[in-house]
Amino acid sequence: MADWTTGYVEGSDGLRFHYARTGGGGPPVVLAHGFSDDGSCWTPVARALAPEYDVVMVDARGHGLSDAPEAGYGVDELAADLRGVIGALGLRRPAILGHSMGGATTLVLAGTYPDVPGAILIEDAGARNLSAGARPDTEADRKRRERMRAWVTGLKGKSREELIAGQRAQTPHWSDDELGPWADSKMRLSPNVLGRQDAPPVDWPALLPAIACPALLVTADPARGAMVTPDGARDLKALVPQLAVAHVADAGHSIRRDRFDRYIEVVRDFLSREYRSAGIVAA
């Protein structure tokens, strides 16, 4: 990690976005984190991929060290931000790997700007986020927003040590390499990110068929907290016919943290088969 670089680029709306980059001569792979995480949470994945790829970890708006505007946290804005970072760094047809919120961002980017990604990989982008069209707001939706607001607010009253201890109690199988960045990301999180709860829904049936690149969905076990169900995976594949689906057993929503070795095996295999074989070269 000593030779990794960090910096800022200006993206959409004049905002500054922080990134870390492994460098090297390999094809570019961009990592898009989930809600409340930041780019540093990808450190173990970046370390594993760095010998073969030029890995770029981006902090989304309101997360990590990127700017945190008061508004603009819809997935459309996040996708435009990520496209801007990719352009500013001069990356050509990068593979984009996104988890949860980052997975939804990656899908929107690939559908809206199909010439940007060389391949996309989605780690448990929630079935709720893949729902087709708009629907009425429900009591369950309102309660979910209230819980999220209370959780984000509660983070600010805890020290790094308290955050790590609390998460370790919930996920004792996570490594220290995961727990440290996880806690750091929560301490850097801006409350403004709660604005994403008021963002309009995405018209997925209209957007997703425009995705032209190879695509992979990595799923896990709903009984352990994974968000994408088998039905949700089938619905997504119906809209993105080239989508490959890889299931990682005994894992929940944070698949890479629960089953790191198997997760990296799946990611490496897809990148080698569908991305490097396409002749993508370093920027």
Features from the language model and the residues they span:
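Flexible "cap/lid" loop of the alpha/beta hydrolase fold
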Residues: G111, P117-L155
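Conserved acidic catalytic loop of the alpha/beta-hydrolase fold
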Residues: E77-P94
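N-terminal cap/lid segment of alpha/beta-hydrolase-fold proteins
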Residues: M1-R16
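Residue in the alpha/beta-hydrolase core beta-strand immediately N-terminal to the catalytic nucleophile
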Residues: D59, A95, G118-L121
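Catalytic active-site module of serine/aspartate enzymes centered on a nucleophile-bearing elbow/loop
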Residues: P241-A283
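Conserved HGGG/HGGXW glycine-rich cap/lid loop of the alpha/beta-hydrolase fold
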Residues: L15-A68
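Conserved serine/cysteine hydrolase catalytic core
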Residues: M187-A238
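Gly/Ala-rich beta-loop-alpha elbow adjacent to hydrolase catalytic centers
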Residues: G98, G102, T106
